[in-house]
UniProtKB/Swiss-Prot annotation:
Homotetramer, a dimer of dimers. One homotetramer interacts with 1 SecA dimer. GO terms for cellular component: cytoplasm. It comes from the Bacteria. Its main location: cytoplasm. One of the proteins required for the normal export of preproteins out of the cell cytoplasm. It is a molecular chaperone that binds to a subset of precursor proteins, maintaining them in a translocation-competent state. It also specifically binds to its receptor SecA. InterPro entries: SecB, SecB-like_sf. This is Protein-export protein SecB. GO terms for biological process: protein folding; protein tetramerization; protein transport. The lineage of its organism: Bacteria, Pseudomonadati, Pseudomonadota, Alphaproteobacteria, Rickettsiales. Belongs to the SecB family. The keyword NADP does not apply. One of its GO terms (molecular function) is unfolded protein binding. It comes from Wolbachia sp. subsp. Drosophila simulans (strain wRi). Keywords: Chaperone, Cytoplasm, Protein transport, Translocation, Transport. Pfam families: SecB.
Amino acid sequence: MPQQKMRIHGQYVKDLSFENPNSPFLSSSKAPDINVMVNINSAKLEGTKNKEEVNEEKSFHEITLHIEVKATVKDEGIKDGVAFICETKYCGIFSIENLKELSEEEVRQALFIGGPTFLFPFAREIIARVTSSGGFPPLMLDPIDFETMYEQQGQQQKSNGSNSNFN
């Protein structure tokens, strides 16, 4: 199996929002229920394919780690029970070298496992800071096993007879 080489060329917050709809009336001392949704998208950046001196192809991709957190509490004084909603799209620009020697599956694994694994700690810190700035204790998301997530998505697609991209 050829060795893949993946490099990051930049990372950034593409979108960030925090809603605190019941402030300053949030008086519940109950711990909120936390619901976390994670999606991963990859977009090939056009016009970035080139031939290196050693005749290797390089492909550039923007990988987006989209995390949405909704905290709810069961309290009669809180409208809709929403304590806060935090959403971020954290992106990285990655290149994959030795592209001609890699299978489509190896490229997908690099994009949907390697990329998000690199980006997650940075997105996690942003969410912790934003929730703290919103008047809540910093929300420290549990680590995510992107390899298991990728495998589960693949099994789900096989059972549905779908070959669509991993999201």
